[in-house]
Amino acid sequence: MGKVDDNKKLKMNTLLQTAFDLFTGKGFAKTTVSDIVNQAGLAKGTFYLYFKDKYDLRDKLIAYKACQLFDDAHKQLEETEINSLEEEILFLTDYIIDRFQKQQSLLKFLSKNLSWGVFQDAVGTGSVVSRQFYDHYRNSLVKYNVNCENPDLLLFTLIELISSTSYNCILHEKPVSMEEYKPYLHKSLKKVYEVFVLSLIHI
């Protein structure tokens, strides 16, 4: 049973990665289901076991790639000495931006789709990756004794701010380059954090 599940997961991941390569290289509109299965070396029937059509695949791929990004960021965070939730937020921001700068195809694909909606859907559907990231965030609120009235709204604001501002700064250096903009982004994130965090709980 384990081998069967592993094989299914392998096939789905192969389809997702192949689709990502084609969507970012050839373009979504010009890519067909036949293109995807042929390059993946799988039968068309296998495709329809996992996805309704290429639009369904694209939506799942956005969540899949976003989850990978959150998972990698979480792993890096676990290896770093951090002393506050605010420091965690800035560390994760820099990690995500650095990945986008190195993998601009990922940035172009996710574009403004790295949103709260995608993240929330992934968590809600039981994605282990997103769940771990989200649970870590909620645990950090407790760990650092942070009193936040609406943690989900804080996370939503942070994700939306980072994703909406990084695209043009990285790809087009407009209105300025990402390196020039980053200090202002950090200050903005700190202010957002201050607005949502009511006070520290002293134990």
Residue spans for each PLM region:
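Helix-turn-helix
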Residues: 14, 22-56, 60
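Amphipathic alpha-helical packing segments from all-alpha helical-bundle domains
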Residues: 67, 71, 118-145, 152-156, ...
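Conserved small/polar residues in nucleotide/adenosyl-binding loops
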Residues: 201-203
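N-terminal positioning helix adjacent to the helix-turn-helix/winged-helix DNA-binding module
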Residues: 4, 10-14, 18
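Short secondary-structure transition hinges
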Residues: 98-135, 171
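Hydrophobic alpha-helical connector segments
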Residues: 60, 75-102, 155-158
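Hydrophobic alpha-helical segments that form the core
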Residues: 148-171, 180-192
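Hydrophobic/aromatic residues within well-ordered alpha-helical segments
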Residues: 11, 54, 65-69, 92, ...
